[in-house]
Design a protein with these regions (language model features):
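A ligand-binding cleft/hinge motif common to bilobed small-molecule-binding domains
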Residues: 1-8, 93-122
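Periplasmic-binding protein-like
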Residues: 26, 116-145, 166-172
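Short beta-strand-to-loop elements that line the ligand-binding cleft
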Residues: 75-88
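Short helix-loop capping/hinge motifs at secondary-structure junctions, enriched
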Residues: 34-40, 134-139
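N-terminal segment of the mature folded domain
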Residues: 1-35
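Short loop->beta-strand "edge-of-pocket" segments that line small-molecule binding or catalytic clefts
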Residues: 43-63
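Hydrophobic residues within well-ordered alpha-helices
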Residues: 45, 65, 93-97
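N-terminal hydrophobic or amphipathic helices and topogenic motifs
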Residues: 6-16, 37-43, 49, 150-175
Length: 175
């Protein structure tokens, strides 16, 4: 939950920035409905010869995917990864739902939207980064006020894998 604070501090030298908690979300494997390959871990992608749709190299979920593979003692080159990367989580889930891939790493809500199986592998905090002076301005305050409404909370609850109980909490207040 705090792995990004040092990156913000390093990148914001001379800038007054505030990091605001938005939500916690689950990242994991989006799997074909019913999980026909019986995938129960990231290691099963290789063992079960799953066709994997990955995100583009610069996507945060691709960086996380490569990290999770390394933790499991494997790498992307060991997998059957589709040539064309997914440009977003909806694209990734669509390819799995159409049978073009067996699995891919994305947020739980992408799997939920397409009625696919989901294997949670990582929980991460999603934050907003704003300049300190902007935090106190009307647009940011209106966004935070809207995000505290019942309608917003209901919509967040409908999106599987998101938790927003601490939304708006300042988790970093730059130098």
């Amino acid at each position: 939950g705090t792995y990004n604070r040092h990156l913000v501090a390093e990148a914001s030298t001379g800038l007054d920035l505030v990091l605001i908690e938005w939500a916690w979300r689950d990242q994991g494997l989006v799997l074909a409905a019913g999980n026909p390959l019986g995938i129960t871990s990231i290691e099963d992608l290789r063992a079960n010869k799953a066709r994997v749709v990955a995100r583009q190299a610069e996507a945060g979920s691709r960086i996380l995917f490569d990290h999770l593979l390394a933790e499991a003692g494997t790498k992307a080159a060991d997998l059957e990864i589709l040539e064309k990367p997914a440009r977003g989580e909806t694209d990734l889930a669509l390819r799995v739902s159409e049978g073009k891939a067996d699995a891919g790493l994305a947020v739980a809500s992408a799997a939920h939207a397409f009625k696919l199986n989901f294997l949670s592998l990582h929980r991460e905090r999603f934050d907003l980064l704003v300049r300190r002076r902007d935090y106190f301005e009307d647009p940011v305050q209106k966004l935070l006020a809207f995000a505290r409404t019942d309608a917003f909370e209901a919509r967040a609850a409908d999106m599987a894998g998101y938790e927003t109980s601490a939304l708006g909490k300042v988790v970093y207040n730059g130098p």
